[in-house]
Amino acid sequence: MSEEGFMLAVLKGIPLIQDIRAEGNSRSWIMTIDGHPARGEIFSEAFSISLFLNDLESLPKPCLAYVTLLLAAHPDVHDYAIQLTADGGWLNGYYTTSSSSELIAIEIEKHLALTCILKNVIRNHHKLYSGGV
Protein backbone atom coordinates (compact mmCIF):
# COMPACT_ATOMS: atom_id res chain seq x y z
CA MET A 1 0.00 0.00 0.00
CA SER A 2 1.30 3.47 -0.84
CA GLU A 3 2.14 5.98 1.88
CA GLU A 4 -0.84 8.09 0.78
CA GLY A 5 -3.20 5.10 0.88
CA PHE A 6 -1.94 4.04 4.29
CA MET A 7 -2.39 7.52 5.79
CA LEU A 8 -5.83 7.87 4.24
CA ALA A 9 -6.83 4.54 5.82
CA VAL A 10 -5.45 5.67 9.20
CA LEU A 11 -7.32 8.98 9.05
CA LYS A 12 -10.57 7.30 7.95
CA GLY A 13 -10.28 5.06 11.02
CA ILE A 14 -10.32 8.01 13.43
CA PRO A 15 -13.93 8.64 14.54
CA LEU A 16 -13.49 12.44 14.83
CA ILE A 17 -12.59 12.69 11.14
CA GLN A 18 -15.52 12.79 8.73
CA ASP A 19 -16.11 13.51 5.04
CA ILE A 20 -12.47 12.97 4.08
CA ARG A 21 -11.74 13.14 0.36
CA ALA A 22 -8.81 13.82 -1.93
CA GLU A 23 -8.26 17.40 -3.03
CA GLY A 24 -6.64 17.80 -6.44
CA ASN A 25 -3.99 15.13 -5.93
CA SER A 26 -3.78 12.11 -3.68
CA ARG A 27 -1.29 13.84 -1.35
CA SER A 28 -3.81 16.30 0.08
CA TRP A 29 -7.30 15.92 1.52
CA ILE A 30 -10.16 18.02 2.79
CA MET A 31 -12.24 16.81 5.72
CA THR A 32 -14.06 17.83 8.85
CA ILE A 33 -12.79 17.03 12.31
CA ASP A 34 -15.62 16.97 14.81
CA GLY A 35 -17.50 19.40 12.56
CA HIS A 36 -14.56 21.80 12.07
CA PRO A 37 -13.27 22.41 8.52
CA ALA A 38 -9.86 20.81 8.05
CA ARG A 39 -7.38 19.74 5.43
CA GLY A 40 -4.38 17.45 5.37
CA GLU A 41 -1.26 17.00 3.30
CA ILE A 42 1.31 14.23 3.28
CA PHE A 43 5.04 14.82 2.91
CA SER A 44 7.98 12.46 3.02
CA GLU A 45 7.59 10.57 6.33
CA ALA A 46 5.33 13.29 7.78
CA PHE A 47 1.95 14.86 7.30
CA SER A 48 0.15 17.96 8.45
CA ILE A 49 -3.42 18.61 9.39
CA SER A 50 -4.78 22.15 9.41
CA LEU A 51 -7.91 23.12 11.31
CA PHE A 52 -9.69 26.34 10.37
CA LEU A 53 -9.45 29.07 13.01
CA ASN A 54 -11.20 32.11 11.56
CA ASP A 55 -11.54 34.36 8.54
CA LEU A 56 -8.92 37.08 8.12
CA GLU A 57 -11.38 39.88 8.92
CA SER A 58 -11.82 38.47 12.43
CA LEU A 59 -8.10 37.79 12.78
CA PRO A 60 -6.45 41.24 12.78
CA LYS A 61 -2.69 41.60 13.27
CA PRO A 62 -2.80 42.29 17.04
CA CYS A 63 -4.94 39.19 17.59
CA LEU A 64 -2.73 37.11 15.30
CA ALA A 65 0.36 38.30 17.19
CA TYR A 66 -1.29 37.40 20.52
CA VAL A 67 -2.29 33.91 19.35
CA THR A 68 1.18 33.32 17.89
CA LEU A 69 2.79 34.32 21.19
CA LEU A 70 0.46 31.97 23.07
CA LEU A 71 1.66 29.11 20.88
CA ALA A 72 5.32 30.08 21.17
CA ALA A 73 5.31 30.68 24.92
CA HIS A 74 3.70 27.46 26.07
CA PRO A 75 6.31 24.75 26.82
CA ASP A 76 3.92 21.87 26.07
CA VAL A 77 2.70 23.17 22.72
CA HIS A 78 4.98 22.17 19.89
CA ASP A 79 4.68 21.13 16.27
CA TYR A 80 1.94 23.71 15.64
CA ALA A 81 1.97 26.77 13.42
CA ILE A 82 -0.52 29.37 12.21
CA GLN A 83 -0.95 29.43 8.44
CA LEU A 84 -2.67 32.32 6.68
CA THR A 85 -4.43 31.69 3.37
CA ALA A 86 -7.01 33.56 1.34
CA ASP A 87 -9.65 31.59 3.30
CA GLY A 88 -8.36 32.68 6.70
CA GLY A 89 -6.16 31.43 9.51
CA TRP A 90 -5.49 27.73 10.06
CA LEU A 91 -3.78 25.90 12.92
CA ASN A 92 -1.35 23.38 11.42
CA GLY A 93 -0.24 20.34 13.36
CA TYR A 94 2.63 18.16 12.17
CA TYR A 95 2.76 14.39 12.62
CA THR A 96 5.09 11.57 11.61
CA THR A 97 3.77 8.79 9.42
CA SER A 98 5.60 6.26 11.59
CA SER A 99 3.36 7.00 14.61
CA SER A 100 0.75 4.42 15.56
CA SER A 101 -2.89 5.00 14.64
CA GLU A 102 -3.74 5.37 18.33
CA LEU A 103 -1.07 8.03 18.89
CA ILE A 104 -2.18 9.94 15.78
CA ALA A 105 -5.79 9.87 17.04
CA ILE A 106 -4.72 11.19 20.46
CA GLU A 107 -2.61 13.95 18.90
CA ILE A 108 -5.49 14.98 16.62
CA GLU A 109 -7.76 15.21 19.70
CA LYS A 110 -5.18 17.53 21.31
CA HIS A 111 -4.97 19.53 18.08
CA LEU A 112 -8.76 19.89 18.04
CA ALA A 113 -8.81 20.99 21.70
CA LEU A 114 -6.10 23.59 21.05
CA THR A 115 -8.00 24.82 17.98
CA CYS A 116 -11.17 25.26 20.06
CA ILE A 117 -9.25 27.18 22.73
CA LEU A 118 -7.66 29.47 20.14
CA LYS A 119 -11.03 30.04 18.42
CA ASN A 120 -12.39 31.15 21.79
CA VAL A 121 -9.42 33.48 22.33
CA ILE A 122 -9.94 34.96 18.85
CA ARG A 123 -13.68 35.38 19.43
CA ASN A 124 -13.11 37.12 22.79
CA HIS A 125 -10.35 39.30 21.35
CA HIS A 126 -12.64 40.30 18.48
CA LYS A 127 -15.50 41.14 20.88
CA LEU A 128 -13.22 43.16 23.12
CA TYR A 129 -11.68 45.24 20.34
CA SER A 130 -14.81 45.64 18.23
CA GLY A 131 -16.84 46.97 21.16
CA GLY A 132 -18.98 43.84 21.43
CA VAL A 133 -18.42 43.16 25.14
From Swiss-Prot:
Induction text: Highly induced 6.5 hours following entry into host cells. Induced in macrophages. Induced when residing in the host ileal loop, when in an acidic environment, during phosphate starvation, and in low magnesium. Repressed by methyl-3,4-dephostatin.
GO biological process terms on file: protein transport
GO cellular component: cytoplasm; extracellular region
Subcellular location: Secreted; Cytoplasm
Keyword check for Protein transport: yes
Keywords associated with the record: Cytoplasm, Protein transport, Secreted, Transport, Virulence
Described purpose of this protein according to its UniProt entry: Virulence protein that plays a central role in mammalian macrophage infection, by inhibiting phagosome-lysosome fusion and cellular trafficking. May act by disrupting the function of the mammalian HOOK3 protein, a protein involved in the cellular traffic.
Oligomer status and interactors: Interacts with the mammalian NIPSNAP3A and HOOK3 proteins in infected cells.
Name of the protein this chain belongs to: Salmonella pathogenicity island 2 protein C
Native source organism of the sequence: Salmonella typhimurium (strain LT2 / SGSC1412 / ATCC 700720)
Lineage: Bacteria, Pseudomonadati, Pseudomonadota, Gammaproteobacteria, Enterobacterales
Gene symbol of the encoding locus: spiC
